[in-house]
Each structure stands twice: as structure tokens, then as C-alpha cells.
Amino acid sequence: MTIHYVDASAWAKLLVDEHESGALAAYVDERLAAGETFASSHLLVTELHQLAARVSAAPTDVTAVLSVLALTMPDAATYRAAGLLPGSVRSLDALHVASALDLGADDFVSFDERQLAAAAAAGIPAANPSNALGDST
């Protein structure tokens, strides 16, 4: 089973219409149809609800975009692992990378280059849906 770990920079594009939103939606649809899994940490729930409040999106929209994800709850070991990741990674980014490691994610889906670099440094291949689908961004 293929597991694609996603962060807020990616999944937010399913909530807010941005340039890469169409590419991400196509990427997700294609992989879900193939039986692949998208996953994230429960941190994403907070991140998306905060985003929704900032852009006046309905909480039901957040629930809808979260509904296709397998969500994991970071435990104390995940927090410790996040603190020990190499480089100077922002705290939430480190928690996402550590959560992806816990899940055994096959790749890390993000539009945040620093986040992708942190994932790659931890041994998780980076995935950028725009690049995968031939978008020029």
C-alpha cells in the first residue's frame, strides 16, 4: 500500500482555490482511484481550521477535505523524534516529518520547499504534485 503524507501547504489547496489547486486535486484523484492512501497528522486538522477562519471557509469544507485522509495522532516518541531531526526545521514541519516517518510514508506531498528538504533529509522522497503532472509552477 502506497502512503502519501501531506502537509498543510498541500492540503490547503483543496480548501482554498490557488494556482496549484487543480493539479493537486487531479494528483489526489488519480492516486485515490489507484487505491493509494493519503495521510497526515492531526496537526493538519488545526492548521486547516485556522486557515478556514482566516479565509472565511466553512468548517464543513474543512471536514470534507479531511475526510479522505488517514490521520495519525503524534505521541511522545514522535515529538522527541521531531526534536532530533537534522537541520533547523520549524516545529510544526518537524512534527509532520516525524509523523510521516512513523507512518512509513512512501513520499511527502508539499508545496513548501523547506518542508520537502526536511522530509528528504529524513529519508522521505519529496513529491510535488505540480511537477508530477507537468505544471510549470
Predicted regions and their residues:
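Short, well-structured N-terminal submotif of metal-dependent ribonuclease cores
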Residues: 1-38, 52-63, 122, 131-137
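Phosphate- and divalent-cation-binding pockets in alpha/beta enzyme and binding domains
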Residues: 23, 47, 117-119
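Conserved beta-strand edge residues that scaffold enzyme active sites
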Residues: 45, 114, 132-133
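N-proximal accessory regions
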Residues: 27-31, 46-87, 128-130
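Amphipathic alpha-helical segments within well-ordered protein domains
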Residues: 9-12, 49, 83, 101
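Active-site neighborhoods of divalent-metal-dependent phosphate/nucleic-acid chemistry enzymes
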Residues: 70-117, 121-124, 137
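Glycine-rich, small/polar surface segments that engage phosphate groups of diverse ligands
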Residues: 41-42
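Acidic-residue sensor for enzyme active/binding pockets
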Residues: 18, 47, 93
